[in-house]
């Protein structure tokens, strides 16, 4: 058994990282791809490793040096016209080597679990491609397989169709060819293909032709959760650095992303409470049906969107400002309109204190294991603290502490007497037992408490965190008017606006997102 590694490409999409290095010299968590690969091959009983080099080939050979000589016999083949050719030509240059032994064919821009080599080598089939069920991050050649794991056809990138993704498997770009297969099938077709269609093609195109033969014995070996990633650009590199990091570092790397976890299909996110039952199928279908129009059209400005937000919650347009998520509005209110001391209950949603200077914060930490507190606890603690603003997240994030609506109104009256403003963040109120009846978003309540402000994320109970919607409401119309001037003219996108628009339809509006 031998290994052939294709490493001639320029890796242009990696930008500065490959300006003076080959793609396989790029590091993931401090280890280069080529070092990781060669170290993995050291555990395999190989007669030799053949590396086809091209771009910065001398630099790669110098980098590898003699560090692996005691465990691997490494040979090099140079592709001098790597700029005008693709990997089919690199493999064609190695065809004489290919027919001399059984072969592991590997692309050099991969990172993968150590177990993959033993998996493919232990498989009894002589000609095998490692494949993985299609996921959204995958790009490149796909295959269809039958119930006996035969590869029935290769699907090149240009023939990819999203309506077929349920049947696609992605090639991992690790193959096992028997010597007999190389001599009698692959190399003859490789020679014919390059002669007919040229050298600027992919070696998988030859396999696509081969699988059309009646007696082609080429199997797929499907991964079962083993990790791997193909690194073509800096985003791939970033994702791979998360997937292949140690446990402690992995948590830190996930945490600093704040979202975008669709890039990690196996990850379950328990950090954010989001309603999985809303929007309704009808709403999603309507959003899909209007996708092209929304993608190509500008959203409305604040006038229309505050009208929609007011209709959404049944309050006056002049009492509400719509944000690109509550986070946009938190930043504005905390940085631009708060200069004195602020009462904050800990632990809390960090976005609020992060927008303040440390000397502004007067923290209250409940002295019990549940971090529970009441309105009376807050009034007692802050009675002599001379705060200008009290922040209450209700239900609390992250403790879950909940103060009833009647007690919040009592707290609001106390704040009024203390000449203290009150912000109530009720982003999670719909998850409480009585749901929306606990909300403070009503004209009557806001008008009776002009010193009180209500913040609400339209992500959690409405199941649309990706749309980035949030509102800030108060009967202090001067404050609302100033905040509307603070946000960009188009601070939400067309999809978010359309969601607000169709939510007002009776058949949808009557569907309670949490309790029905």
Q: Can you say where each PLM-predicted feature lies in the sequence?
A:
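Conserved beta-loop-beta/alpha segment of the NTase-like Rossmann-fold superfamily
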Residues: 71-141
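N-terminal glycine-rich phosphate-binding loop and ensuing alpha1 helix
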Residues: 1-58
């Amino acid at each position: 058994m031998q290994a052939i590694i294709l490493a001639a490409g320029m890796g242009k999409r990696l930008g500065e990282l490959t300006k003076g290095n080959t793609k396989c010299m790029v590091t993931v968590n401090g280890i280069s791809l080529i070092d990781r690969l060669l170290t993995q091959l050291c555990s395999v009983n190989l007669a030799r490793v053949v590396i086809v080099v091209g771009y910065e080939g001398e630099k790669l050979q110098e980098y590898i040096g003699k560090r692996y000589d005691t465990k691997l016999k490494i040979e090099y083949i140079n592709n001098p016209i790597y700029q005008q050719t693709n990997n089919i030509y690199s493999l064609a240059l190695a065809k004489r080597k290919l027919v001399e032994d059984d072969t592991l064919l590997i692309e050099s821009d991969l990172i993968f679990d150590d177990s993959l080599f033993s998996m493919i080598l232990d498989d009894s089939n002589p000609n095998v491609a490692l494949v993985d069920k299609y996921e959204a991050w995958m790009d490149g050649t796909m295959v269809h397989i039958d119930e006996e794991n035969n590869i029935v056809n290769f699907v090149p990138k240009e023939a990819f169709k999203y309506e077929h993704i349920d049947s696609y498997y992605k090639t991992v770009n690790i193959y096992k060819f028997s010597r007999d297969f190389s001599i009698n099938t692959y190399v003859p077709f490789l020679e014919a293909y390059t002669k007919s269609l040229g050298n600027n093609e992919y070696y998988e195109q030859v396999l696509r032709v081969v699988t059309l033969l009646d007696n082609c014995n080429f199997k797929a070996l499907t991964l079962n959760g083993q990790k791997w990633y193909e690194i073509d650009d800096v985003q791939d590199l970033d994702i791979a650095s998360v997937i292949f990091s140690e446990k402690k570092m992995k948590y830190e790397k996930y945490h600093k992303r704040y979202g975008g976890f669709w890039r990690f299909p196996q990850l379950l996110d328990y950090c954010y409470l989001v309603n999985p039952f809303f929007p309704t199928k009808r709403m999603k279908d309507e959003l899909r049906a209007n996708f092209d129009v929304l993608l190509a059209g500008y959203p409305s400005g604040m006038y229309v969107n505050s009208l929609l937000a007011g209709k959404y919650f049944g309050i006056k347009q002049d009492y509400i400002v719509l944000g690109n998520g509550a986070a946009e509005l938190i930043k504005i209110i905390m940085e631009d309109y708060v200069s004195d001391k602020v009462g904050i209950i800990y632990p809390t949603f960090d976005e609020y204190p992060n927008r303040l200077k440390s000397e502004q914060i007067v923290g209250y930490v409940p002295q019990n294991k549940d971090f529970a507190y009441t309105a009376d606890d807050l009034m007692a603690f802050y009675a002599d603290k001379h705060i200008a603003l009290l922040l209450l997240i209700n239900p609390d994030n992250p403790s879950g502490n909940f103060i009833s609506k009647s007690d919040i109104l009592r707290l609001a009256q106390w704040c009024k007497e203390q000449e203290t403003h009150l912000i109530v963040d009720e982003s999670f109120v719909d998850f409480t037992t009585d749901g929306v009846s606990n909300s403070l978003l009503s004209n009557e309540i806001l008008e009776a408490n002009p010193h009180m402000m209500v913040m609400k994320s339209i992500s959690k109970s409405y199941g649309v965190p990706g749309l980035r919607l949030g509102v800030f409401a108060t009967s202090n119309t001067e404050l609302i008017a100033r905040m509307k001037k603070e946000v960009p003219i188009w601070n939400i996108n067309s999809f978010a606006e359309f969601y607000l628009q169709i939510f007002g339809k009776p058949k949808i509006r009557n569907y309670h997102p949490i309790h029905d």
